Amino acid sequence: MATVAFHTLGCKVNHYETEAIWQLFKEAGYERRDFEQTADVYVINTCTVTNTGDKKSRQVIRRAIRQNPDGVICVTGCYAQTSPAEIMAIPGVDIVVGTQDREKMLGYIDQYREERQPINGVSNIMKARVYEELDVPAFTDRTRASLKIQEGCNNFCTFCIIPWARGLLRSRDPEEVIKQAQQLVDAGYKEIVLTGIHTGGYGEDMKDYNFAKLLSELDTRVEGVKRIRISSIEASQITDEVIEVLDRSDKIVNHLHIPIQSGSNTVLKRMRRKYTMEFFADRLNKLKKALPGLAVTSDVIVGFPGETEEEFMETYNFIKEHKFSELHVFPYSKRTGTPAARMEDQVDENVKNERVHRLIALSDQLAKEYASQYENEVLEIIPEEAFKETEEENMFVGYTDNYMKVVFKGTEDMIGKIVKVKILKAGYPYNEGQFVRVVEDEITEHMRLSS
C-alpha cells in the first residue's frame, strides 16, 4: 500500500486543508505515516505570512528530501502560491501546487512517476472566483473541529501578503457549510470553529446572504451542536444583525477574537485598516451590552513603521480601558513584497521588543482579571488532552466556551465530552479546576429517571 506523510506550517486554515488533502489520499488507498517516518509521498503545506514562514517552510522541505530521497516531494500552501519558482529551485522538489487545485495533486503524482519531470501546478490565484470545495468529515488529532467557510481577502492591509497567497474573497455555499457542520457533529464533535482567511467577511461576495444569516442557520439547523466558535472577525464585520444573532443563540460561544492590530488611528491609516478606534470602541460597547461576560481576544502588531511612543501608548491605553481578555502580540516584521516593508521610519528592534514585553505583561494581567470573575463558579469545558506540564498524574486541559484554559484532574474518557468543572484558582496561562461531573452522564441519567 502506498504511504503519505504530511507536515503543516502556519494557521488553522492550513491545518484544515491538510486534513482535506489527506481525505483525497485516503480515498485513493494511501496509508498515513508520521512525517519523521519513511513514506512514498511527502506533502508539505507551507506558510508565507512572514519571511520566517518562508524560511521554516524551506527547512521542512529539505528535511523531507533527506528523509527519503526517493520519495515524491509535493509542496502546497501559501509559500508555494507566492514563490513557486523559489521552491522548484530546491533540488529534490517534485511537485508544487498553490492554494487551489489541490484535487489535482494525486494526478500530478502519477504524472511525475511516469515522466520523472518536476511539475509546477501553480495557477494565478487572483483569477479564482469560486470557493474550492474540500470536505473534511473528521480530524486526525483535534477535539474542536474546524469548518472552513470562506477563502481569500479583499483588504490588502499594507503589512500583509495574504491576498497574494489566497486571492480575493470567495464564500462557501451555505448549504455545503451546514451539511459539513452536521457531518462533524454526527462524527462526535461538540464544538465547531468557523474558520477562513477572513472569516467574518463571509457572504460579502453574495447577493442576498451574509455572515449573520449563516450563523443563524448553523444555530437552528445543525442538530446536536453544542458550541459554535468564530475563529476571527473584524470590527467592521460585527454588524447589528450579527450582534442580534449572538444575543439570541445559546450555542455561539461567549468569546470573539477581534484583531485590533493597533489602537492608534494614525497607525491604522498607515496599515490601511478599515476602521477607526471610535468605531471599534462603539462595537465593543454594543457587544458587551448584549453579551455580558463576553471574552474578547485580539491580535496586536507592535512597532509598525513610524510608530511613536505616543501611538504605542494609545494602543496600550485602549486595550487596558476596554479590558481585552487576552492578546496575541507580534513585533512588526518586514514582509517582502508588501508596501509596509518599503516604508521609511522602520522601528528599532530593541524598541519593538521592549513594547512587546509591556503589552504581554498587560495581556497577562488582563487575562487574570477576566478569569478571576469566575473563581468558585462551575463552568463547562471540553477536555482536549492530557496536561503534561505537571508532575501530578491524570491531569487534563480544555477550554470553557469563553476561552479560559482550565486544568483539572480527570480521566482519559472525558476527552471530547462536555464536563462541568469548578474553577478553584484563576490564573494565566491556565486556571485550576475541580471536576464536578460529565454533562452527557447527567443527560442520560435524567432520561433514565424520566422514562
From Swiss-Prot:
Free-text comment on the cofactor: Binds 2 [4Fe-4S] clusters. One cluster is coordinated with 3 cysteines and an exchangeable S-adenosyl-L-methionine.
Catalytic activity: N(6)-L-threonylcarbamoyladenosine(37) in tRNA + (sulfur carrier)-SH + AH2 + 2 S-adenosyl-L-methionine = 2-methylsulfanyl-N(6)-L-threonylcarbamoyladenosine(37) in tRNA + (sulfur carrier)-H + 5'-deoxyadenosine + L-methionine + A + S-adenosyl-L-homocysteine + 2 H(+)
Ranges of residues in domain Radical SAM core: 139-369
Stretches assigned to the MTTase N-terminal domain: 2-114
SUPFAM superfamilies: Radical SAM enzymes
Protein localization: Cytoplasm
Protein name as catalogued: Threonylcarbamoyladenosine tRNA methylthiotransferase MtaB
